[in-house]
Amino acid sequence: MFRKIREQISVQLSLKPRRVVLAAILLLNLAFIVISAFVISLLSVSGTEEMGFWQSAYYTVMMVLDAGNVAEVVGDVGTAGLALIIICLVVVIVGMVLFTGAVIGYLTNYISSFVDNANLGSHKLYLSGHIVILNWNSRASEIINDLLYSDEKKRIVVLVQDGKETVEREISERISDTLAQEREGGLKNKLTVIVREGDTFSTKQLMDISIDRASSIIILGNDASSTTCKYELKSKLEGHEKGNPQVIKALVQVAELTGAQSSADDQKIIVEVEDDWTHSLVKRIIENKQVDGKCNIVPVSVNKILGRLLSQFSIMPELNLVYRELFSNKGSTFYSLATDEKDEHAYRSRLLSDNLCAVPLTVMEKDGAYTEYFCAQSERDRFREMSSPVSDINVSLNKNYWLEQRNVIILGHNSNIRDIMEGFNSFRKEWNHDGNEIMNVVVIDTKPNLEKMDYYRDYPYVVKTVEADVYDRDKICKTIDRFVDANDQDTSVLILSDDSVTATDIDSGAIANLIYVRDVISRKKRAIPSFDEGKIDIVVEIINPKHYDIVKSYSVNNIVISNRYISKMVTQLSEKDSLFDFYQDILTYDDEGERESKEIYIKKVLRYFDEMPPDCTAAELIRAVYRASSGDELAEEERTETVVLGYVKKNGKMVIFGGDRTKTVVKLENTDKLIMYSNH
């Protein structure tokens, strides 16, 4: 019997030590009170002979709690028996140890343990409608930062494998920087961010952060360049090229939990994908695990999106300024709403006539449901109707308008280079005509990287490749100088940041190449004072946002912080996953002869119009251009259905139409460029 009791205690001590200790404390105190009460009742003095067991027990407890209660039992010390006095003193002393010490010690330990567990994040969170971020990379803090500009309060839970304190510090620094920059605008922090450290594949830990009640779940990939060790970096890069099984594992787990009948409806799962193998498996998971009405899985192809963006920025550098705002929650941005409208021409015409603030873009159909897309400063702007009709003006468009040849120098490389070239291919298919080549590209890179791309022989528009590393200053400068002189049109210099280097070397090569390009411009300016610096458009990609000020000091307007674009897109998709199809559309040019896809273009005012438009309001300009580009009298190949979104001045100042369009005065000049949404 004793052996079985001892075995049971041993098992319970291993499974639930805290409960066993508490039970032992209670039993010892109970035994002590019973024994003390029995002895005191036997030794009661004159006047307390009637003190029974329960009264003795009561006084025992009172003496333990307050030693002054000894007087209630002893009475007059002179007449009390020595034995009773000694017993009472023993009760007080032993009680202080057994009761006060043990119980207070236990409670102190329990509270301390509770606080530690809370800091470690091991207790369950009871939340709903929150955003969950699984894993951490260089884009994660930008996702949280962009949510600062949301109209609503947001609760975000981050679950990472390790480095909780580092993540918390990074979030705090990023938010503090933004709040300091936006102090004049009155931006307030409406975010509640909880960071937890644990196993992102654990069902229990995922349920502990109420993943089944979240509005959105964002699954991030890992950074290969986060290490400072070259050998570790090489191993990570080799793994990244093959695929990312961790993302797949996390997605399967999340899809299972969010697809359950008990989970919340319409949950959005945004998953970063960086390679074809992972993307193909994500597609299969969507086919087998996605439950309509429960969870919608949206794969974000990081390299393809960055490649398309960088190719578009090379072709039209001002697009960087445009997308920087439109892909953000700050200022004017893209919105989507379910609609019964099926005809996009009728939709645009109606909204341009009736609405005050929203700029209509398109209507898209998916699975029998229709969604309208518009540009505005707030979703509420969609429902602000005009109080009075807008006057109309007439504009004359250049019916023979065609984009000029694009001259591009690619300086350096990154992991998105093939996707950048695919972006050029897509652009050529839409804009090459009559045997004329729209693209004219020179690539300057190291010999190993050029060999890896087979010296760009698959791309007939690459007219020259130059072997040079970051130390070949003269060769780089001479190549740029000669290419600029050989072409009458502007030249875009796309400076890429190598993302296959260690964390300490990130952006170093890009900054060195930027210095070389600025030297070329400075020398030309000294030789020919009238040289137009705008003839060389510098587009610099950086990976680490902390290097922004360094690059900006070289008078560069088009700084592409590549990670921020993905972060901004992920943020918007986490709130409106229907924007995914729209983004796919504007980032992809049509094949030759097709005009179904619509993109955002930058077009020179002087070439786009036959005559300069008069000074007018934004509302008048948008309506006039749309009528002139979509009229029934136009031939099909002339009908572009163009919606003007804003314009860019020669000095780089950008205006995107937002708010009350009737109050925005537009005075276009010959050197201005229009921002427009069009099918060609």
Feature roles, as predicted:
Residues 1-680:
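Cytosolic regulatory regions of ion transport systems
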